[in-house]
Amino acid sequence: MFKKVESKVNFPKIEERILKFWNDNKIFEKSIQQREGCEEFTFYDGPPFATGLPHFGHFVPNTIKDIIPRYKTMKGKQVKRYFGWDTHGLPVEYEVEKSLKISGRYEIEKYGIDKFNEECRKIVLRYTKEWQKTISRLGRWIDFENNYKTMDTTFMESVWWVFQTLYNKGLIYESYYVLPYSPKLATPLSNFEVNLGEYKEIHDPSLTIKFKIKDKNEYLLAWTTTPWTLPTNLGIAVGKDIDYSKIFDKEKDETFIIGTKRLNHYYKDEKAYTVIEQFKGEYIKGIEYEPIFNYFLNQRDKGAFKIHTAEYVTTDDGTGIVHIAPFGEEDYNILKNNTKTDMITPIDAECRFTNEVKDFEGLFVKDADNKIIEKLKSMNLLFKRENFLHRYPFCYRTNSPLIYRPISSWFVNIEAIKEKLIKSNEQINWMPSHLKKGRFGKWLENARDWAISRNRFWGNPIPVWICSKTGNKICIGSKEELERLSGQKVNDLHKDKVDKITWPSEYGGVYVRTSEVLDCWFESGSMPYASKHYPFKDKDNFHNIFPADFIAEGLDQTRGWFYTLTILGTALFENTAFKNVIVNGLVLSSDGRKMSKSLRNYTDPMEVINTFGADALRLYLVMSPVIRADDLKYSDDGVKDVLKNIIIPIWNAYSFFITYAIIDKFEPNNNINLHKTNILDKWIVSEIESLKKILNEEIDKYNLTKSIEELLAFIDKLNNWYIRRSRRRFWKSENDNDKIDAHETLYYVIKNLMLMLAPFIPFLTEEIYQNLKTKDEKESIHLNKYPQAIEKLINIDLEEKMNFIRKVVSIARALRASHNIKIRKPISTIYVVTKDQKEQQILNEMKEIILEEINAKEIKIKSNEEELVTYKAKANFRELGSKLGVNMKVGSLEIMKLTNEDILKIINGNKHIIKINENTYNITLKDIILERHERENLKIINEDSVTIGLDALITEELYLEGLSRELIRKVQNLRKENNFNVSDRIILYIDNSDILKKITNQFESYIKTETLTLKIEINKEKALTNVELDDAIFIKIGIKRWSN
């Protein structure tokens, strides 16, 4: 029935064999086909870029995205899952620019947009085979063949429909606005994309500039940290209610206006200036000043070069006076609301000054800072220069500084649907739950209109055609609509193709498409519709698969994909796009830094899998903080520990069962005997049925952390309690009912455990299942149903009893270890103290287990600790402080004088009065801190309500028994080293040392039983292995397989 389990196991090799079994037998396909007609469980897979290889950051969500669909499939749902590729956008363009050795918008246009886009198309799926190989090797089941790509015409057409639907609802508009802008990419970014990048600490020049008040010999001292914006200065801002001082600078012989609170920053000596006048900012509002540069003098008639009041001005730094240019959102709004100035932006697409600013023409704006400063010096307008350290946003694609600039862009009106977004969020089950009201909820509350246009090339074009004569706009929502209006056949919706499509306007002009493409986040947010070509295909079935039952990605997607899914789902259908989401954290290198190929600070993921196995890696990841959206400092040693402490123990339990099942010719059946008499069998069966119940509840709630904790706790119970305590039942030669029950129980438990573990570690569970399954069972473990609890087999009372006993044993073993008393050395007495009568009853019922586990001869169960300890006491200052007040110091000395008898009375609830300065105080147990002092030869430990004591006095008889146990261990090791089978009987050879004679004479029967020895023989010639029984006690032994 069962195949023998090899003693040496190579888990990666097993996994490769299982992978071949799945592929050859199309097990994944069968898992979906067998659920045809069942309720569908909808899962959306966020599309990655295929321009880079998968890394640990991908492994976490891909593991989660495999666990849940496998589980739901085993729960009877049909879970279709398709891989997707994000094929448009800046990452692809950036890669092509590098390969073509070109950079920037102008060079791309010179190269040719059509040729550039063709290069993008060529590289966009560069690593798809590597992705498929890696993700499959991780054990994830997903359909790669029927994948979707955002560059597919069907996908792009659905995105046009999404855009048109929002446009027709009035939720999309075009406007001029200050936006974060990537000079290297020559395109604006959305605010949430800024948050996907990194804020770095950088030093910028901090300048204080002199602005001359018109027609007066007085200067405003204005502050800026962006010198490059000074050529476009159009105004100055002060705080309406801020106090300002007009001063005369004695050294410079000039008059300045400055925020009063900032005087001491600029003048260390108050005698260096004279205060002429003080006033509020409101007083100088509207005053005109002379521009420091003459590039835009024509703006004076439109309201430029005046003082404005603004709430954002402070005196925390600078001068309390700031210069205004249309390169900041607040500045832009002041100019827009208070002047009629043109929104001058004399910089090109790559943020180089144009010929409007002749002195700095062709310079990148940040590179112009020093030249501008030199110019100011030469004009005697630079009052002070310092350096300013501050956090500044960098582009998440190019890692270069962003520039804020006014630019025309298309927006989704988030403000109009904000309340609906918040309502949609209420419908989502977040795991971890704090994200709902925390990171994601707060992001929604503060969400701003979404800039969705990009001045780029390889993307989904914004489907708006504008009349060249009137500016009338037509928004297109399908290929058919575009063909009807233009009279041209449309096969490809990319920019280089549709930009050539024009048609005459009824107003006399020509309809030409607006030049921008869509933010690729708009496309990924459209994935639920576009991947299904909605509404052009299967429209009636769509609402059966929307919203998704489940999605999973990293924490950064709270401001990325989760956000755009929520926006578009709410805007289109007033519904969330997903019901449940598991969010993972970031995987860092072991030193806490970001994983980096250049730093080589992490192991290649495939090397990890080929060394330890995918199951070990999967389990390591889902056991870690990363599953709770916290960061994980990855280490190979962590995966190695999972292999050693979890995977191998599971294998050992399975190997133990198979070994004895083969020996005893055990024939399994899938029914469990409901009338078992052995308490261990009853307990472990109850435990696994309880585990089934818990796992079904917790995984249904998407709580993988709790699920894993429960599984690991059970594996420990199985190996370190049930199997260890049941070994002799398998060892005995006769096949009595107890042995049969042990086989049946272990078979049932291991098989059910594999079924429960299958979604988490699919390879190992498949390997074990293939050897355990009967002929009439499913071809693969993953085609089975997930185990459901048999309620009548659950015995909570028995579980609580056994857990209490395990706790007592654990505490006692820890006590032995802390005093270096090896478990093989027997002790005379163990004391267990508890006041709980139920616990005392359990101890009496199961004292034989405790004695065996602790290796003690006698157990004494007590209600108090009097026989074990003597007490001393210290004052509990926190409690006594309010009671004793000024008498606290004397009171603490009185408490230190309490006798053992005094303390016992307090423990037992009796009054104990102390008298201090004519005042009396009743001292209770909470007023003192107990100190336990062990009585002679006793070792004591206290945990919660239980105190354990061990009698550490070792008699000669106990000492010899301990040595006999040590001898047994040495013989067992020798059996393993010689590759003896567990059922092999042996002859044991020993030398003629006195100590060995004593041990074998007194414990011969015990030694024979434990080591399957049929004969012990004194034979120096054959006892050749030197072993240490105890400190400095060396003996020689040998073994030989028994043959009749």
Swiss-Prot record:
This is Isoleucine--tRNA ligase. It catalyses: tRNA(Ile) + L-isoleucine + ATP = L-isoleucyl-tRNA(Ile) + AMP + diphosphate. IleRS has two distinct active sites: one for aminoacylation and one for editing. The misactivated valine is translocated from the active site to the editing site, which sterically excludes the correctly activated isoleucine. The single editing site contains two valyl binding pockets, one specific for each substrate (Val-AMP or Val-tRNA(Ile)). Monomer. ATP binds at K597. A motif ('KMSKS' region) lies at residues 594-598. Its EC number is 6.1.1.5.
